[in-house]
Every structure is written in C-alpha cells, then in structure tokens.
UniProtKB/Swiss-Prot annotation:
Domain Thioredoxin stretches: 25-129
PROSITE patterns noted in UniProt: THIOREDOXIN_1, THIOREDOXIN_2
Effect of deleting the gene: Dwarf plants with short roots and small yellowish leaves.
PANTHER family named among the record's database cross-references: THIOREDOXIN (PTHR10438), THIOREDOXIN H9 (PTHR10438:SF434)
InterPro entries (UniProt xref): Thioredoxin-like_sf, Thioredoxin_CS, Thioredoxin_domain, Thioredoxin_H-type-like
Lipid-substituted positions (S-palmitoyl cysteine): C4
Disulfide bonds: C57-C60
CDD domains: TRX_family
Record's protein name: Thioredoxin H9
GO CC term, one of those recorded: plastid
UniProt record, GO biological process: cell communication
Active-site residue numbers: C57, C60
Gene designation: TRX9
Taxonomic source organism: Arabidopsis thaliana
Length: 140
C-alpha cells in the first residue's frame, strides 16, 4: 500500500502519460460537474466511489488501471476521479491528507473512506458495498 502526501505542482509533464480515467470512470473537472454526477447517482440509486488522486503520485498511477477495471466490472456504482491539483480548493474541503483517497458516498453522504493504493482493500470495500445494496427494481 502506498500514498503520497501533498506536494506542489511541478513542471515535469512526463508523469501525465498514465491513463487515470477510462472505462466507466467520470473525470470531475469542476465543482458543478461533481454536483451533477452526485445528483445523477442519487436519482439512479447508485453509490459513488470517488478517487481523489494526483498525476504526480506514484501509488495513484499504480492503482489507476485497477480503479478503471473496477468501474467496468461494477456498473451499478458510479466511479468519479478528482485531480487534487486541478480542484485544490474542492479537494481541501474534503480534507485530503494523502493521495489516493477514496470516498464512498450514498445520497451524497460519506459511507466509507480508504486512504492509499491498497488494491485488495479497495476491492473488499467495493464488494462489501455491492453486497449491502439490495437489487433496485427496473425503472419503467
């Protein structure tokens, strides 16, 4: 397991070659897009898995493909990605001390949190959440 503590943005763009979003991961670029996705999740009865990450963070780069893989396997959840440098004020409001930090949200409220790139623990949390949610009836 690893995590990175906050650091200033560097001028080294070579770290941007890792795919952080893809699959069913929605990249959040504004507070408004965050609010829109949370409203969509609430409307659709989905639990949100939010990954607060940084492009310069080694453990974030390691866990990113796994996060994408989880998003593809578990379409009943909504997976969001927030770049802590791009949305620094917003990330600070979530009290992010290290990256990656994963929040699990239901109806906009935190129901779980995981700090660090611990793939087995992330898998365990996702599985636990899926197992705890009753099957939703099909919408007309």
């Amino acid at each position: 397991m690893g995590s990175c503590v906050s650091k200033g943005k560097g001028d080294d763009d070579s770290v941007h070659n890792v795919e952080f979003s893809g699959g069913n991961v929605h990249l959040i670029t504004t507070k408004e897009s965050w609010d829109d996705k949370l409203a969509e999740a609430d409307r659709d009865g989905k639990i949100v898995v939010a990954n607060f990450s940084a492009t310069w963070c080694g453990p974030c780069k390691i866990v990113a493909p796994f996060f994408i893989e989880l998003s593809e396997k578990h379409s009943s959840l909504m997976f969001l990605l927030v770049d802590v440098d791009e949305l620094s004020d917003f990330s600070s409001s979530w009290d992010i001390k290290a990256t990656p930090t994963f929040f699990f949200l239901k109806n906009g409220q935190q129901i779980g949190k995981l700090v660090g790139a611990n793939k087995p623990e992330l898998q365990k949390k996702v599985t636990s959440i899926i197992d705890s949610v009753p099957e939703s009836p099909q919408r007309p």
